[in-house]
Amino acid sequence: KLKDKTVGIVGAGNTGSAVAKCLQAYGVTVLLHDPVIQDSDPRDFISLDELIACCDVISLHVPITKTGEHKTWYLFDEARLNSLKQGTWLLNCCRGEVIDNQALIKVKLERPDIKLVLDVWEGEPNPMHELIPLVELATPHIAGYSLEGKARGTFMLYQKLMQVLGKDADKSMTALLPSLWSVQLDVESIPDQKSLLQLARFIYDLRDDDELFRKTILDDSSKNPQVNSLNNNGFDLMRKNHLHRREFSALRLVNTGHSDVNWLTNLGFSGIGQ
C-alpha cells in the first residue's frame, strides 16, 4: 500500500512540490531533496544519499545541468543506482540524462527488484532499445501533455497580449476547456487505494501510452532498421500526435455520503463539498 511507503522527491520546485502535496494529502510520508533551494526554503530537506537510503519510491523533478556544484547530469550514476533500497521504484519525468541509462541497463539486469517508470530517456528521440523491455512503464516524454496544461499556457499568452494592448482580459480559462465530467461519490469512509486508482484511470490510463510506446519503438524498429533515424523513429511522432489527457480537475466529484473526503481537493479533483 502506498500509505505504508516513503516517497522521496528529488527537486522540490513547482512540479516536485505539486507531487509532494498530492502524496501528503493522501497520507504518504514524503522526503525532499533540493540543495539549490534548501537554504531559502522553510521546508525540511535531506541529502540525496539519505533520501536513497530511506525511500521506497523516488521521483525525479530536476532541470538538467552539466556543470556546477549541483549538476544533475548523471545524478543517478551506477553507484547511486546500486545503492537503491531493495524493491525501490524509480520514476523519472524530468530529463533523461539525469540517469545514466547505460548504467541503468546494467544495474537493472543485475537487480530486477528495482522497478522503473520512465517518461524521459537519454538520447531522445532515440532511447536505448535495450532499456525499454526492462521498464515497468514507458512513455515518450508526455508527462506534461495535459489539456489543462495547454490551456494554462494559452491563457497566460492571452492575458499578456491583452495587457500589451491595454484591453481587459474578460475571458476565463474554463472557456478554453470542455465541460467537467461529473461522478457521484457515495462513500461511508475514505476511498481506498483501489478506488482512487479507478478514478485516476477513468481520466487517463497510463497503460495505453505504455503499450503504444513499446509497439511503436520496439516493433517498428525491428521491422524497419531506418526507424532509428532522427526524423523517423516514431518517438517525436507519438509526442506530436498525443491525445492530451485531462487532469484530475476535469472530474467533478459529488459527495453524497457522510465521510470527510474534502482532502480529495488537494489531489486536484473538482466539486468536493459543493
Curated annotation (Swiss-Prot):
A GO cellular-component term linked to this record: cytosol
Residues the entry annotates as binding substrate: 145
Compartments reported by the entry: Cytoplasm
Residues bound to NAD(+): 34, 119, 144
Known pathway: Cofactor biosynthesis; pyridoxine 5'-phosphate biosynthesis; pyridoxine 5'-phosphate from D-erythrose 4-phosphate: step 2/5
Signal sequence, renumbered to the chain: none
Catalysed reaction, written as an equation: 4-phospho-D-erythronate + NAD(+) = (R)-3-hydroxy-2-oxo-4-phosphooxybutanoate + NADH + H(+)
Description of how the protein assembles with itself and partners: Homodimer.
Function field: Catalyzes the oxidation of erythronate-4-phosphate to 3-hydroxy-2-oxo-4-phosphonooxybutanoate.
Protein name: Erythronate-4-phosphate dehydrogenase
Originating organism: Shewanella sp. (strain DB6705)
